[in-house]
Amino acid sequence: MSYGALLQLGFLGLLTASIPLLWVWVKGDADKYRKLVWITTFVTFDLIIFGAFTRLTDSGLGCPDWPGCYGHSNPVTAGEMIRAAEAAMPSGPVTMVKAWIEMLHRYIAMGVGVLILTLMGLAWARRAELKRSPWPATVLFVLVCVQGAFGAWTVTLKLMPVIVTIHLLLGVLLLCMLGALAAQTNPLPIGANAVARLRGPVFFALAVVFGQIALGGWVSTNYAVLACQDFPLCNGALVPAMDFARGFDLTRPLGLNDDGSLLPVQALVAIHWVHRAFALIVVVVLGWLGLVMLAAASDSAYLRNTAWGLFALLGLQVATGVSNVVFAWPLAIAVAHNGGAAAMALLLALLNSRLAARQRDRPVAFAAGARA
């Protein structure tokens, strides 16, 4: 890729970031750090949803090189090569539409990188004024760089399932860390008794949700959503024939065994069935947590609203998960299922951060009159 194309690509990333940055700096709020943290969290959530859309539309190899598209910064100037690839393999992964989807995903990802770089710079420049350590923002910048590397390997290793799944998990981790940072800038009052009752259960629930997201990512990256054709049974059986060893082999390429032979259907069934079975554990854990939160809420509107939000997201996940099977994996429902999982992780990360801050007796725990 030429230096000129790299400069154009960098400019497009800056242009993507300039819209939220302009909004932060033009608004009259004096606490620009707080506003930047929240807008970066929002854009990162959007990036995760668009990443799911990219994966679900089979656009991950719409541009088979990285960081550009056939050595160009955009599909327009790479149009001749894209059309040639499509003509050579009409049912292949390269089309003009898929190339645009993939490159838009990369532009947004670069924009998030610029936002986090700006956030880190602001955290260090105003560390005395903010009275916060700049190291969390620095860790975020390191994480987004690692995430970018996995984004590159996703393409260069031809959608290898373990790489794509780690890429997804790092994205959710980045979102949750941004949420934790955002929670510290938006203090809400939580009683000491509620903290004592909820600190452990919330952290445990967050770990369970991360585990289920990992399993869901493994289903998606292996295209195992329709391996079970019915619900609540799986291909007419409560426990169908499954091949766990091959299904959960982390070293194999997409759709193949290590020896190059096709992955058996039983392996895909195992992947799907484990995700479905673990969903029962998630429902029990989050349902129990929601009830504990309501019992501990007392006069805390935040805890009550969070509990009901958790119930709503849990219902959304169950409904969209079942619908993916019953309605043969419609795109809109599949994207909503991915977005709901990310939203659930973010909700728990926000709550976990506020509970942790209260437990450490930071000012965030005692502040009243939280800002919207």
Question: Which role fits each region the language model picked out?
Answer:
Residues 3-11, 99-118, 161-174, 270-288, ...:
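Membrane-interface loop-to-helix entry segments
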Residues 56-102, 225-268:
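Extracytosolic (periplasmic/ER-lumenal) interhelical loops and adjacent juxtamembrane/interface segments
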Residues 50-63, 142-168, 219-230, 318-342:
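Interfacial helix-loop-helix junctions of multi-pass membrane proteins
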Residues 180-197, 201, 346-372:
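A juxtamembrane structural motif centered on a specific transmembrane helix
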Residues 1-30:
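Transmembrane alpha-helices
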Residues 32, 121-138, 290-310, 370:
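Membrane-interface helix-loop-helix junctions at transmembrane boundaries of multi-pass membrane enzymes
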Residues 36-58, 208-219:
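N-terminal signal-anchor transmembrane alpha helix
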Residues 43-50, 135-153, 204-212, 305-326:
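Small-polar-interrupted transmembrane alpha-helices in polytopic inner-membrane proteins
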